[in-house]
From Swiss-Prot:
It comes from Wolbachia pipientis subsp. Culex pipiens (strain wPip). InterPro entries: Ribosomal_bS20 (IPR002583), Ribosomal_bS20_sf (IPR036510). GO terms for cellular component: cytosol; small ribosomal subunit. This is Small ribosomal subunit protein bS20. GO terms for biological process: translation. One of its GO terms (molecular function) is small ribosomal subunit rRNA binding. The keyword Amino-acid biosynthesis does not apply. The lineage of its organism: Bacteria, Pseudomonadati, Pseudomonadota, Alphaproteobacteria, Rickettsiales. Binds directly to 16S ribosomal RNA. Belongs to the bacterial ribosomal protein bS20 family.
């Protein structure tokens, strides 16, 4: 348990940040899951919109410091490869 006043405040701030970061990660995972489901269904019309949404969420997480930029780049690259494979098929 924190002994200093500033440490007690930081515990509250960390708890709030943790909730916000969990929300952002969850939103991003949901967007990725939706994109993968659309790719599996073979829906070429909605796949571009879903990809933009997933990519946007990943970039937002990077800008807020929730995930590392290399992690986001890797995920975007892999998703983009799946989208391109669907579009050419």
């Amino acid at each position: 348990m924190a002994n200093h006043k500033s440490a007690k405040k930081m515990m509250k701030v960390i708890a709030k940040r943790t909730l916000v970061n969990k929300m952002r990660k969850s939103k991003t995972r949901t967007a990725i899951r939706r994109l993968v489901d659309i790719i599996k269904s073979g829906d070429k019309e909605n796949v571009v919109l879903a990809f933009r949404n997933a990519e946007s969420n990943l970039h937002k997480c990077v800008n807020k410091g929730v995930i590392h930029r290399n992690t986001a780049a890797r995920k975007i690259s892999r998703l983009n490869a799946k989208v391109k494979a669907l579009m050419t098929a």
